[in-house]
Amino acid sequence: MILWGGSGGYLVIILYTIMPVKTIEEYEYDFFRFILIFFFFQKGSKHLSVVISILKYINAFKGLLFHVCLHFCSIHRRLFQYLVRVLQVFQLFFKAAVISGIFRYTIPIHFLQKFFKLFDN
């Protein structure tokens, strides 16, 4: 994924290293936001819809992980943060690959094309 993501992927990884772990309230928000988006947001091109769906499912999985850990497990907070961090890494790799790979060829929007040129060598 990183190789396919190109320099955009490396930029996201650098940004990731300075990002804090989300709070529990933010994961709860992600979970409910996923439900709303799933039912009300089904627009865009076929490729864009697939990408958005994958990102929605990743966010939903993080939300479900939060609820399971909070209500049914006596899991240590550090372990929970580690699991969340693994999911964040996967999500950021996927976003980086999408930004520098797919969107360039599927969205014919002028300002987005200019933006993606910044990530090219």
Curated annotation (Swiss-Prot):
Record bears the keyword Membrane: yes
Residues annotated as signal peptide: none
Keywords recorded for this protein, A-Z: Membrane, Transmembrane, Transmembrane helix
Source species, domain of life: Eukaryota
Membrane-crossing segments per the record: 1-21, 55-75, 92-112
Presence of the UniProt keyword DNA repair in the record: no
One Gene Ontology term, aspect cellular component: membrane
Membrane topology: Multi-pass membrane protein
Further comment found in the protein's record: Partially overlaps FAR3 and STB2.
Protein name: Putative uncharacterized protein YMR052C-A
Source organism: Saccharomyces cerevisiae (strain ATCC 204508 / S288c) (Baker's yeast)
